[in-house]
Amino acid sequence: YRVYTRQGRVFSVEDEHGTIAEDMPVVREGRTRAWVSIMYGCNNFCAYCIVPYVRGRERSRDMDKIVAEVRQLVAEGYKEITLLGQNVNSYGKDLDIPQDFADLLAELDKIDGDYLLRFMSSQPKDASFKLFDTMARSRHVAHQLHLPVQSGCDRVLRAMNRPYDKARYLELI
């Protein structure tokens, strides 16, 4: 149980497993780059990784909350906004009404302004041609991918418990 204060307001935070605390104040420095978490946790269980055990399973934020946060950042003059998640490509699969990462990017692209959207990390197992098409058509999404290329060896990828192989990477790029 923790209490945070900001500008005279008090926020109480209780750790409730599997929930996302929305509307918490975010302290950002400068007005150039901002980072926006779109999801928390991970479902991949790579052999060497502790994230699913300490952060839990994937939990996506509501699209409306993300769009509102990015709209506010653009209004405040931020020029580069990076969307964050252990595996952004699986965004929205856990929501009551499942959504798609490409759909989120398309919604964010509708926000007027002079800004660039980036995202990381983009796991190849959930990358789709719909995502690439959305990126290609977008006015604001950077035409680059942050792919965690940790090995080009199928044997090593299997040992890492990665559900894809070198051929899948080559298909994507």
Where do the PLM segments sit?
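Proteins enriched for Cys/Gly/acidic motifs involved in redox and nucleic-acid/cofactor modification
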Residues: 1-91, 145, 167-173
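Conserved SAM/AdoMet-binding glycine-rich loop
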Residues: 75-173
